[in-house]
Amino acid sequence: MAAKTVKKTRRRKERKNVEHGAAHIKSTFNNSIVTLTDAVGNALSWSSAGALGFRGSRKSTPFAAQMAAETAAKVAMEHGLKSIEVYVKGPGSGREAAIRSLQAAGLEVTLIKDVTPIPHNGCRPPKRRRV
């Protein structure tokens, strides 16, 4: 008896028609992650410097953040996204570059908000680096 081969059919992602959404930019010292969502918060597209193939110290550059924002914007604009609110989190170098890249891609930015979490004297920070 030969084993039956079951062919799995992959479901194509349906094209959502969203005009207004949000861009969440998380920019750390090591990486930049850009997620574009609809108004509710469901992700339309995402990209990061590491996912694009940047490795090591190049991952934390403004250029890497710019490329991540560009690729995420292209996919989201296929879903009909036109205007976004930008929420920026983190102390990284790619914050401004990612916002500029989203505007250059053709998305209208209606709001820019810094949502970096600030502790009310919470955890002890890591010790200073001595190089």
From Swiss-Prot:
Coiled coil: none annotated. Located on the platform of the 30S subunit, it bridges several disparate RNA helices of the 16S rRNA. Forms part of the Shine-Dalgarno cleft in the 70S ribosome. Belongs to the universal ribosomal protein uS11 family. It comes from the Bacteria. Residues 1-23 are annotated as: Disordered. Keywords: Ribonucleoprotein, Ribosomal protein, RNA-binding, rRNA-binding. The gene is rpsK. One of its GO terms (biological process) is translation. One of its GO terms (cellular component) is ribonucleoprotein complex. This is Small ribosomal subunit protein uS11. GO terms for molecular function: rRNA binding; structural constituent of ribosome. Residues 1-15 have a biased composition (Basic residues). InterPro entries: Ribosomal_uS11, Ribosomal_uS11_bac-type, Ribosomal_uS11_CS, Ribosomal_uS11_sf. It comes from Clostridium beijerinckii (strain ATCC 51743 / NCIMB 8052) (Clostridium acetobutylicum). Part of the 30S ribosomal subunit. Interacts with proteins S7 and S18. Binds to IF-3.
